[in-house]
Amino acid sequence: MDTRALAEEPEPGEVGPRATVNPRLFRRAPRATLAPDGEVTVRFAVTRAVPAASLYYGTEVPEDPFALARLRRVSSELSIEDGAHTLRFDLRRLLRAKYDVGRVLERGVGVLRWRVEALDPTHGTTRVHDGRTAFSCTPTPCTEDSELVQLPTVVLGPFVDRVDHESATLSFETDVPTAALVAARSEGGRVRQGRSPIGTWHEIRLTGLRSGVRYRYLPLVVDGRGRIAEGRSATFSTWPAPDEDTRLTFAVLSDSRSGLGTADEQYAGTNRQVLWDLMLGALREGARFTVFVGDLIDGYRSHAGAVRYELRAWQKAIEPVGASMPIYEAMGNHEALIEYWTPGWAIGAVSPTSMEALFAERFVNPDNGPTAAEGAPPYDENVYSFDAGPAHLAVINSNYFWRSHFWRDDHPAAGRGFGEGWVDDAQLEWLDADLAAARERGQRHLFVFTHEPGFPNGGHVSDGMWWEGRHPEMLAQRDRLFRLLARHGVAAIFHGDEHNYSRTRVHDGLVDGLERPLWQVISGGAGAPYYAQERGVPWASDVRAFDARQHFVLVEIDGDDARARVVSRTGETLDRFDLTDAR
């Protein structure tokens, strides 16, 4: 489905049948099995014809955690067996001294990295899927006569989230049900451990950590056969104690859905190539954490499995950085699991699951948001807040329970859902109390994040919270939000949605009754197709900066001072400004 159909106006009373939208290519994701003789078989099922596919593979280099997989050989002998597409290769071809970068022969264990690249003639492109498979040799050290054993594998992660001065949450996924343990230790410190019950998705909270200390951690998993394997080791730093935490650097970016070009720019709904460069750039710049303000994926799908697949691909894209730097995710309009009726009606699904519930299932964010009404999607982990040093950050959802054509009474879901850009009353009441409490705790710098811009500048002037001024109730709710921000002294609100960078001064000439000006910052340059500036908006003279280059925003706080620097994908500084002085 072309999402432009959702912007068309159906004829009055014109409601067609429900339809499936945007099925993914891989109906069953590629999965590898390893035979004792070293033969690896990768099988997958598809939703449409795949005339050709290749399988690239290599062993993991343990000393290179921030590098993308380096692949050494290829197999292209595609066959169809029992309805599944099948590719095979001999792992022993990699277990030769000249290829043994992972020292598998010596250690007796290794991790195989592999990629399926399938031709999708329907769309004239290729689709890729990346995997990993842990294995061991019996006996050790490996020889040509050793038996190869497939081990339980950490196939996604680990990720570090919800870090503070004394705790952190580690999460990861395994290919089979496992019990899991994470061990963490600082230099010269005690080992801290956390455990997770049997399952494939593990979230483990480590407590009793020391403040301002770097920890190295290691996931360990054991399957039902008693086979034990390690996940990837990584490091993270706890935050300084609140009374010592006066300096802070964090990054903001959004809109990494598919671009145009290579398979990695259309990586299961994500522009992996650009996203990876920007995330690594933020880490190099010293960001303690990142806030990602929505449109992670292409979305707009009618099957929960297709949305899960895209969210998982996004996690795969940020995986190496996410092992060491917490990433706080927000929902955008493309995070959409929908019910769809021709010729263009849609609403966010609620049963058997919702996009909001899937979001909480895949990500680890604070869960201190408002309580949803009965029968409505949850706010859990898509509306939340947290303190970081002298700052307080609040994330709200301007695409909560999204519905197309919200102004139409003949919508098949009339009376349910909200329009794109609407921040509902429950969120505004929660945000009001949350910001007031942050001020009472003495937090000096307040920031709010939501995907839809109040004052769009390039690409989304026909929606966002503006809708070209066509919907007075939307404008009134927008102004209510901005008055609330100003009343609490919020320094800036960060948005995405538009695939560019802009900085706009919002003042009482734009919002009646605004107590003080503040910055609106749009940072949507993480890989989605570009938009140019549109200068016909009423606030064009208040736009202080605009740039179409891919980028992230770096917020740097030192005591009472807070400044922002906009950094391009190539490391150039595109803009600098004082967050405490919106003029």
Language-model segment annotations:
Residues F172, V176, G286-I297, R301, ...:
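Active-site beta-strand/loop signature of hydrolases that rely on acidic residues for catalysis
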Residues T143, Y217-P219, S258-T262, D298-S302, ...:
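Active-site environment of divalent metal-dependent phosphoester hydrolases
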Residues V252-S254, F289-D295, A323-N333, I396, ...:
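Active-site neighborhood of phospho(di)ester-bond hydrolases with catalytic His/Asp-centered motifs
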Residues R247, A251-S254, S258-E285, F292, ...:
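Internal alpha/beta domain cores that form substrate/cofactor-binding pockets in large enzymes
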Residues M1-D264, L283-R284, Q443-L446, A548, ...:
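Acidic, histidine-bearing metal-coordination/catalytic regions of metal-dependent phosphoesterases
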Residues F159, P219-S237, G305-E440, M465-P472, ...:
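Extended active-site neighborhood of metal-dependent phosphoesterases/phosphodiesterases
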Residues F292-D298, A438-S462:
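Short acidic, glycine-rich surface-loop motifs adjacent to enzyme active sites
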